[in-house]
Amino acid sequence: MAPFPEEVDVFTAPHWRMKQLVGLYCDKLSKTNFSNNNDFRALLQSLYATFKEFKMHEQIENEYIIGLLQQRSQTIYNVHSDNKLSEMLSLFEKGLKNVKNEYEQLNYAKQLKERLEAFTKDFLPHMKEEEEVFQPMLMEYFTYEELKDIKKKVIAQHCSQKDTAELLRGLSLWNQAEERQKFFKYSVDEKSDKEAEVSEQSTGITHLPPEVMVSIFSYLNPQELCRCSQVSTKWSQLAKTGSLWKHLYPVHWARGDWYSGPAAELDTEPDEEWVKSRRDESRAFQEWDEDADIDESEESGEESIAISIAQMEKRLLHGLIHNVLPYVGTSVKTLVLAYSSAVSSKMVRQILELCPNLEHLDLTQTDISDSAFDSWSWLGCCQSLRHLDLSGCEKITDVALEKISRALGILTTHESGLLKTSTSKVTSTTWKNKDITMQSFKQSACLHDVTNKDIGEEVDNEHPWTKPISSDDFTSPYVWMLDAEDLADIEDAVEWRHRNVESLCVMETASNFSCPSSACYSKDIVGLRTSVCWQQHCASPAFAYCGHSYCCTGTALRTMSALPESSALCRKAPRTRLLREKDLIYSGSEKSDQETGRVLLFLSLSGCYQITDHGLRVLTLGGGLPYLEHLNLSGCLTVTGAGLQDLVSACPSLNDEYFYYCDNINGPHADTASGCQNLQCGFRACCRSGE
């Protein structure tokens, strides 16, 4: 019978595990053939893993037991300052790196046995002292309920750290296991043949169909999948099935939480204490010098735990990027890196490049910058994205929003329902209305054949996304030559471009007028796109006229129920046809069955104080954000009411209840929007911080 009630005995259970490990390494030490290099290295690797667990055990005791006891008793100090764990780990590392031959192995073995014997003589009495001396003191200074809570935390920490370490080993050994399986393939096949001769009737789990195995694997968490991948080549391939890796939560996994379901069940804002803990981890990790020999005597237990967790998180992220995502990246739908201590812009960039079909991306309170989105370099490369949370990402600027807007793609209806502006720069002559040639007219009112002999050099693919284009460089786009007496109202015409109409709406712009707004594309856009991405996903009609009354001054809007005969318009020979039907100018009733871009439902830029009106207006390109319901711009200090209005006008589904922006801005929906969420917030930008 234990001397203390089991539910409050904080030492016995963890110490049982430590004593078990001591027995295991003593047994291995006695059985190892130090003349054999494989046996020698296997022992050192096993010892290294064992002593890492010893060190983690001591750190947990420091933080959750001894640290609390020191707060209530002044007689406790330097309990773990005399241990030799770091020295032993250094000894194992030197053996693995420096010992090269049998002679050195035998000399090293002598030193190893002496050091292990000395450590064991100190370590076992050390644990006995904790059980016989410190447990009674805990009973004296803590209540029964407090001790129950302490024990629960101690056991949970031991389990989570052990599970995380096993996951990391699984990730790193994934490819190594495959190589070993290939090496033993023939011997295994030979053995299987012999077993089949003995009992042809027997059926094991290895004979189950792949679809059944994948169904079984779907009940496993990431750690268990990594273990299964090491069983055989077949299991390794099945463990890389994309459907098993749809939802990734590396930050949670590094802390022992193996949830891998849809993100909707995790959409809860953490309390400020939890956020502070994650920020402390991040700061400790950044300050930590990887080359330093950190010992419990040099670092507080709390700081050591924080560094260890951040290190695990970093290794786990590297494991995912190099060993998992190259195989399953296209199937990943959810990536949650919120409050990560170790993630970098480079890591995010690599992950986004490997996961083109993301629907849910959460980078809340991470230290990323605009470069994290460099992999979103072509139009529509992540057009399935529905949820994007960049709350607290203070380094994000308009540059990132330009890349994000480009990645969201272009609405099919937006692309097909607008005028096609010219995409080439005129070098020597200007285009005239008389140059227009019609070759055929269909019900969809397509302008089939338009070109110009004086086409200049190609414009850079990203140009329309990065800066406004001055109309001084080129002239008006092609327009229909219609009866000037039948003019339509300008505001009616603005509505027409958002819906299908039977008659044809035509806009003739004043050639020398340029809207001063950086996000207004009422001006012409140069450059017929020749790259594959542009030809597949968009063309100039995506950049709609802004609809501002003041920028449309001098514009003649006309309607007509039928198109004139080509002879009425043509004065020159027919020109060469454009390459693709998709690039033609038309306005009609054609609609796509399903939108494939700009389906964003949730966008949070809370605390991204470097965002300006330009960044907001970039989001209105390509058809705006027609499905957006939740928009959080709390703490975006430099945006104005005009910029907000431009964005909101491109978000017809926006719910005022989930629309947040600074209370000091006189913006849209001022009476019904929810205001700023960052008031007196300790960890996100706000104009009233400190009040």
From Swiss-Prot:
LRR repeats: 340-364, 365-392, 393-418, 479-508, 576-607, 608-635, 636-661
Entry keyword annotation includes Lipid metabolism: no
Keywords: Cytoplasm, Iron, Iron-sulfur, Leucine-rich repeat, Metal-binding, Nucleus, Repeat, Ubl conjugation, Ubl conjugation pathway
Modifications after synthesis and translation: Polybiquitinated upon iron and oxygen depletion, leading to its degradation by the proteasome. Ubiquitination is regulated by the hemerythrin-like region that acts as an oxygen and iron sensor. Undergoes constitutive ubiquitin-dependent degradation at the steady state by HERC2.
Amino acids binding Fe(3+) 2: E58, E61, H80, H126, E130
GO cellular component: nucleus; perinuclear region of cytoplasm; SCF ubiquitin ligase complex
Entry keyword annotation includes Chaperone: no
Pathway assigned to this chain's UniProt record: Protein modification; protein ubiquitination
Residues of the F-box domain: 202-248
Highest taxon in the source lineage: Eukaryota
UniProt-annotated binding residues for [2Fe-2S] cluster: C662, C676, C686, C687
Any one Gene Ontology molecular-function term assigned to this protein's record: iron ion binding
Compartmental location: Cytoplasm, Perinuclear region; Nucleus
UniProt binding sites for Fe(3+) 1: H15, H57, E61, E130
Cofactor field: [2Fe-2S] cluster
Regulation: An iron-sulfur cluster promotes IRP2 polyubiquitination and degradation in response to both iron and oxygen concentrations.
Region Hemerythrin-like: start-end pairs: 1-159
Example of a GO biological process term: intracellular iron ion homeostasis
Complexes and interactors: Part of a SCF (SKP1-cullin-F-box) protein ligase complex. Interacts with ACO1/IRP1, IREB2/IRP2; the interaction depends on the [2Fe-2S] cluster. Interacts with DCTN1/p150-glued.
Function: Component of some SCF (SKP1-cullin-F-box) protein ligase complex that plays a central role in iron homeostasis by promoting the ubiquitination and subsequent degradation of IREB2/IRP2. The C-terminal domain of FBXL5 contains a redox-sensitive [2Fe-2S] cluster that, upon oxidation, promotes binding to IRP2 to effect its oxygen-dependent degradation.
Domain notes: The hemerythrin-like region acts as an oxygen and iron sensor by binding oxygen through a diiron metal-center. In absence of oxygen and iron, the protein is ubiquitinated and degraded.
Name the UniProt record assigns to this protein: F-box/LRR-repeat protein 5
Classification of source organism: Eukaryota, Metazoa, Chordata, Craniata, Vertebrata
